[in-house]
Amino acid sequence: MKKTKCLFDEEKQTPAGMVSVSQLQSFMSCSKKWEYGYVENLTPRVERPYLSIGKLCHKGMQVVMQCAWKNQRTETPMSKTEVLRSALYAIDCDWEKYMEENTFLDEEIPDQEKMLEDAKSVFEQAFHEFDIDKYEVVTVYKDGRPLPALELHFVVPCAGSKGLHGYIDAILKDKNTGFTWCTDYKFRKALSPDEEEAYNIQNAVYCWACHKMGIDITGTMTWQHTNTPATDPQVLKNGAMSRAKIKTTWEHYAECCVRAGLDPADYEEEMKEKLADNEFYRPTYEYRNLETVKRIWNDAVVPASYAVKAAYKKNNRRSMYPWNCKMCQYQSICQAELRGYDAQAIRDREYVVRQHRQLTEEDTADVVSKI
């Protein structure tokens, strides 16, 4: 019976006593911040959960690649149009569920509807840029049952803890090159420089996880896309389309011309070149060989795991410097404790105890079958 090693077993395992990359990163940045978040399990109190464009687009990518995996295993594959429709439907469903589970004032609803509209616009653009036909989804096996390597929950042995667990967005094989990439989707306001990928400990850990699962990968691909939709060009008073350079694509500009009853050919020569350097997405590749991954694991991850274990039994230091503290979600408690204020009152007023993520069988099921 085929069985992929190191897959998290939801029926037999819980994250209790395990560590995650986010936990280790929190500890390495400030052990007091880690204590607030992982010992006290505090998270800022909010009126309602926050649904972002990034979360909705991530759902869309998950469904798209599930369709791609299903296409690999059937004689009647879905067309790209059907795949896109399925993904947009899943985005709609997530948004509708969010709206049903939370209370909104009437005047707040248009903002939420605009967010959905923007998310679908961003995702549809990303769908065409990603090119799902380029990749094959790697198949893993759980108790002999084939599963796509998508939203893959793993747990690998990690000294100092009961294991390190995490979720891999996708493991994809490039059909042209044969390279296999541990893939992470990022929808963000601004694209990060490629140079930062060398310091991405999350992706290095995911490489180690793939190695322990017995999956040979070439490296990691962080596929990042802006989370703002392409801008619509302005129709001038004389009925012509503005030729100003804006943050949009030529394809979107041409579509706006058609909607306005204009011929895109009249604008193509000038505008196609003018808009060519607008960057909406970038795949960032990092080729990590196994020796590099081992060194990162042994020199950074394992020591942090041991330090986390020890930190449960001691008073943790505060890493006080502006860049760290101004971005910290626990700064109000930290400052209250340092100044002798009523920190417990702030805990009760501004924070709640976090509920840990529980992955259900429905989460791991092929959502395409439900569409």
What are these regions (language model features)?
Residues 1-371:
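RecB-family 4Fe-4S metal-dependent nuclease core
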